[in-house]
Amino acid sequence: METLLKPLTSLLLSSPTPHRSIFQQNPPSLNPTTKKKSRKCHFRNESSKLFCSFLDLAPISKPESFDVNISLVDPNSGRAQFDVIIIGAGPAGLRLAEHVSKYGIKVCCVDPSPLSMWPNNYGVWVDEFENLGLEDCLDHKWPMTCVHINDHKTKYLGRPYGRVSRKKLKLRLLNSCVENRVKFYKAKVWKVEHEEFESSIVCDDGKKIRGSLVVDASGFASDFIEYDKPRNHGYQIAHGVLVEVDNHPFDLDKMVLMDWRDSHLGNEPYLRVNNAKEPTFLYAMPFDRNLVFLEETSLVSRPVLSYMEVKRRMVARLRHLGIKVRSVIEEEKCVIPMGGPLPRIPQNVMAIGGNSGIVHPSTGYMVARSMALAPVLAEAIVKGLGSTRMIRGSQLYHRVWNGLWPLDRRCIGECYSFGMETLLKLDLKGTRRLFDAFFDLDPKYWQGFLSSRLSVKELAILSLCLFGHGSNLTRLDIVTKCPVPLVRLIGNLAIESL
């Protein structure tokens, strides 16, 4: 995974993470074979032709920038001193800057392109953004969602889903930062240096900026956050496109949360066998009859599933659904490290966003949680930096890290990671059975699980209910595949409680 992320580190340092953290790339061309065809090769060649014609379409959208009069730090000025330096102007970084600065704390946000549009699409449950007062930052809402378990069973969920308007959300956060006198500096951060009560960042242009606290909101590939345990992440990988199509089969009032059907691979035996072991699903947002966002997603795998494999499965699925793409408006590659250990707590650099451990280990969701937890972290920062005691150094680091990750939240995180470890052990049939039982639970539990708002006790109840609602084969999966992750969970909970 380190090899996969390394060429994209610079992009991530400028555009932190999301619900779905995006690496945008133009897919390589594939030349269709010209060998004499057997029946099996015929199907492979037809797939290759479609693969080329669809994935070779260049996205027609162009990078956008915001026309906001942000206050910039003069690169030629002398010593620049702030209370808080935030690395990255993604959703998490700007949300934190907004909330810390409203208390009069001096904040500098460092990003190579702070006025650029975020590249990734974000989907959230509508009630999550309503609870945060951010409902006006949604550009489309669906009153229902659906989950296709297989060709014969579909779950309809009465929980509205929305797509985040990147433009509205970023504009709102930028304007709040401007109003609160946040300063911005256009550069990449190369190094973070520490003294006893002060830290400094060194930028790629040689500029040094000092502050009492450095917060890294630069995304998954950051080198500034330290771990004291092996980073045994699972990985979510997806290929997504916003496309104009001739037509599509989706209901306009329903967002497709997961489509686990594999009938589209009937003529693709080499893909079907792999999908049976490491399944992918379709995530679809239909906006009108000719505009739809489509994403083929591997929920979690270890090691990361081949990106080319994901794209081939998507081509086969769209062909089976009869979806003819006229043009690709936006394209995105999503790679999200999930689960694994939390960063070392405490340490000299604080984190928020993808590198802070707040990604949902079983789903990859994060943007709503970032919006919710940034004010929590801001409060811990303000209590330290804004206090009459002038808390700095190790005491400040301890306060802010434990503000984001108190004991109960760390224990809850271990429980969610247990869910991820269970998913890693399931094939397509096991995954279908699990979600069939999961979405039959009381909405309090499945909704709470997906939104990261259940307590340890509630998660235990959910597990018992899931066992009770599951089929005999689901129970067999739980009994045979969960003991090792369960023992690890109990051990980690014991360590956290010490």
UniProtKB/Swiss-Prot annotation:
Keywords: Chloroplast, Isomerase, Plastid, Transit peptide. It comes from the Eukaryota. GO terms for molecular function: lycopene beta cyclase activity; neoxanthin synthase activity; oxidoreductase activity; oxidoreductase activity, acting on paired donors, with incorporation or reduction of molecular oxygen. NAD(+) binds at residues 84-112. Residues 1-33 form a transit peptide. One of its GO terms (cellular component) is mitochondrion. Transmembrane segments: none annotated. It is an enzyme of class 5 (isomerase). GO terms for biological process: abscisic acid biosynthetic process; carotene biosynthetic process; ubiquinone biosynthetic process; xanthophyll biosynthetic process. Its main location: plastid. The keyword Iron does not apply. Its EC number is 5.3.99.9. InterPro entries: FAD/NAD-bd_sf, Lycopene_cyclase_b/e. It catalyses: all-trans-violaxanthin = all-trans-neoxanthin. Pathway: Carotenoid biosynthesis; neoxanthin biosynthesis. It is found in: Plastid, Chloroplast. SUPFAM superfamilies: FAD/NAD(P)-binding domain. Residues 22-33 have a biased composition (Polar residues). Residues 16-38 are annotated as: Disordered. PANTHER family: CAPSANTHIN_CAPSORUBIN SYNTHASE, CHROMOPLAST PROTEIN, PTHR39757. Involved in the synthesis of neoxanthin, the last product of carotenoid synthesis and a precursor of abscisic acid. NCBIfam families: carotene-cycl. Belongs to the lycopene cyclase family. This is Neoxanthin synthase, chloroplastic. It comes from Solanum tuberosum (Potato). The gene is NXS.
